[in-house]
Amino acid sequence: MAKVFGEAPGRLDFLGGVADYSGSLVLEMPLRLTTRVTITETRIPELVFHSEGQESCTFPFGTDPQDAPKWVRYPYGCLWLFSAAQRWKPKGGLKFQISSSVPESMGVSSSAALEVATLRALEKLSGQVFTGTKLAKLAQRAENEIVGAPCGLMDQLASAYGVRGALLPILCRPDRLGDPVKLPKGVIALGWPSGVKHAVSDSPYATARAGAFMGKKLIEKGTKRKLTHATELSPSQVRSLSEEVLPTSLTGRVFQNRCGGVDDPLSTIEASRRYDVRAAVSFPVEENNRSEIAVSLLRGISKTNRQDSLKVLGELLYQSHAGYSSIGLGCPETDQMVEGVRSLGVSKGFYGARVSGGGSGGTVVVLLDKTSLPALTRLARKLKRPTNFIL
């Protein structure tokens, strides 16, 4: 009986975040923390799932994965879709053993790490290896179709193809990977857990996503220009649009009467809900611009412009954080943390901070000098926030 394993890291969302679904450039960093999935063949034709802190689950073959507990849907969904895509079936039963150091509900892609690790194990077990970015795309399908979370492809790409110690530029149209970009020597980006749990399947994220696609459709209708991605526009182009073309907000019913639906299969427009469409579509356009500037700064950094470049880079993080709040993905705890970092300032080795991933809690990304870590620990204790920083 064969026994194989797959392993994949969580990721730190440096810039980009929820702009991925609008075709933005994002900058992602793999973590040291990983998830390992061990799959063992058994003679009994059944599926068994074990995970630390969860009750074991056993299913006969053919059970719909959507009938399983939510935590099981991630690995089972990967198996279900892998079997269909690769036309492969195990010879007997399978036992899945999951262990992970990636914290859950903290915005560092514990789900993507689990999906990618599962698919890597299945590659070994079946002898069928994915080419290109197919593994990441199948992992995203498991989360979208089986788990029911409307995430973009960013997390899975970062977990599958990121390089340790560097930022991976990903142009989410849908999966163009750039060359990794390193931070200057002595400077680190880390995750500071807020202690506030979040989930991509929750309403604020879904509302922001739907609002972005509604905004895109309104722009297309008002300008008579077809857009594949909203981020094909520049921030100045969006700002120049009139209230008539791109209103500040409108209800789902008014939008449907004006435009019908959106071209995003993962978004549902609720007729009675009011959507802040201008902010929702402006954020990814501006975030794409921030990510482009960040890559340019990091690739051109030198001893003579180091501090100035880091100061501008930090301001991009602060702008991104404010953008999250504008689309309903902020929270008081992360606002307090970011302002705490800002108060310490560049003179003490703190360049910038932002809420990351899906927002609404989770993890704050901090850009700082490595020597400033003790000061961040003191700030965390002062604010009564966690000190278990994520690297």
Where are the language model's segments positioned?
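C-terminal nucleotide
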Residues: A2-R11, R36-R73, A84, A166-R354, ...
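Conserved phosphate/anionic-ligand binding catalytic regions in large, soluble enzymes, centered on
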Residues: D20, A112, C151-S159, R354-T363
